[in-house]
Amino acid sequence: MNDSEFHRLADALWLTIEERLDNWDGDSDIDCEINGGVLTLSFENGSKIIINRQEPLHQVWLATKQGGYHFDLKGDEWVCDRSGETFWDLLEQAATQQAGEKVSFR
């Protein structure tokens, strides 16, 4: 994958997260902000989830209260380079914990 393809895929991921949060009807308020290629989810309790892109590595990084994760594209899925879990699984787990209620991005 070249840099422009990586940015196209990362932009699509950011857009999907935004759209799914816009359609989410949970009780908690989750704010989504994109600034300089970094996507920040802010929760009512003051906690945050930070998602950014690492262009030189063609990775997406996810920072949560539980820890940091690095994802490589494998086929059509962003997969954690340590655990093998998908981006969506880890994002949902972290968002659910930080929101205090079930959050789904699917």
Curated annotation (Swiss-Prot):
Instruction: Identify its protein family.
Output: Belongs to the frataxin family.
List the Pfam families hit by this protein, alphabetically.
Answer: Frataxin_Cyay
UniProt-listed InterPro entries: CyaY, Frataxin/CyaY, Frataxin/CyaY_sf, Frataxin_CS
Q: Which domain of life is it from?
A: Bacteria
Give the protein's function.
Involved in iron-sulfur (Fe-S) cluster assembly. May act as a regulator of Fe-S biogenesis.
GO CC terms in record:
cytosol
The cross-references to Gene3D superfamilies, in alphabetical order and at most eight, read: Frataxin/CyaY (3.30.920.10)
Tell whether ATP-binding is among the UniProt keywords. no
A single GO BP annotation from the record?
A: iron-sulfur cluster assembly
Q: Which SUPFAM superfamilies match?
A: Frataxin/Nqo15-like
The molecular function terms of the Gene Ontology recorded here are: ferric iron binding; ferrous iron binding
Official protein name in the record: Iron-sulfur cluster assembly protein CyaY
Keyword annotations for this protein, in alphabetical order, are: Iron, Metal-binding
